[in-house]
């Protein structure tokens, strides 16, 4: 409901320690916080609690994230406002209520989000999808192709899915329940 959504937004709107450092003048993303190698690859080992297959964290605002990839699947849900992403060179504006899912082959850049641009990132290890694939069964569809691509290494044709679902109430309620 609306009250729950307002509580979620209020909770997610709080300035984090990382965001405060940015507001105090830090001009670049602290790559060590997210990545351990030379290349800027977001590392689940640094971001996910040990033993978890999936976790949720608020998107860091006020700073541009340079081109990076992930060693996990990232699902971004736009709670309020919008964010601009460039995925493998293609510009995507993620608006309130929309969902963007990236596999490990996606190279992502993110423009700075403002104070009222509230997004949550779901970090999902590829192993999470093993069971999902068994449940989907044999029929061919875009989601299945995407999940199979998440489990493979190397180039796959479909590296992101963008769902414009702001008007799909059951999906909105499901995501709200996941976040809260």
Task: Name what the model sees in each region.
Residues 13, 24, 35-36, 69, ...:
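Generic serine detector
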Residues 31-67:
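Short, contiguous, helix-prone interaction/anchoring segments in small proteins
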Residues 2-27, 43-47, 113-180:
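A hydrophobic/aromatic-rich effector-binding and dimerization subdomain
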Residues 52-144, 148-150:
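N-terminal regulatory/effector-sensing and dimerization cores
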């Amino acid at each position: 409901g609306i009250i729950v959504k307002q509580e979620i937004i209020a909770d997610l709107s709080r300035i984090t320690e990382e965001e405060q450092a940015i507001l105090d003048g830090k001009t670049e993303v602290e790559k060590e916080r997210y990545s351990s190698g030379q290349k800027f690859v977001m590392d689940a080992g640094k971001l996910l609690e040990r033993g978890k297959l999936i976790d949720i964290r608020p998107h860091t605002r006020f700073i541009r994230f340079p081109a990076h990839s992930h060693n996990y699947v990232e699902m971004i849900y736009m709670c309020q406002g919008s964010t601009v992403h460039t995925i493998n060179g293609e510009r995507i504006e993620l608006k309130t209520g929309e969902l963007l899912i990236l596999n490990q082959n996606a190279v992502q850049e993110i423009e700075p989000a403002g104070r009222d641009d509230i997004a949550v990132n779901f970090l999902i290890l590829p192993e999470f999808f093993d069971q999902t694939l068994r449940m989907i069964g044999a029929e061919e569809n875009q989601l299945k192709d995407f999940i199979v691509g998440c489990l493979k290494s190397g180039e796959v044709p479909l590296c992101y899915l963008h769902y414009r679902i702001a008007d799909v109430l059951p999906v909105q309620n499901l995501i709200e329940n996941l976040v809260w």
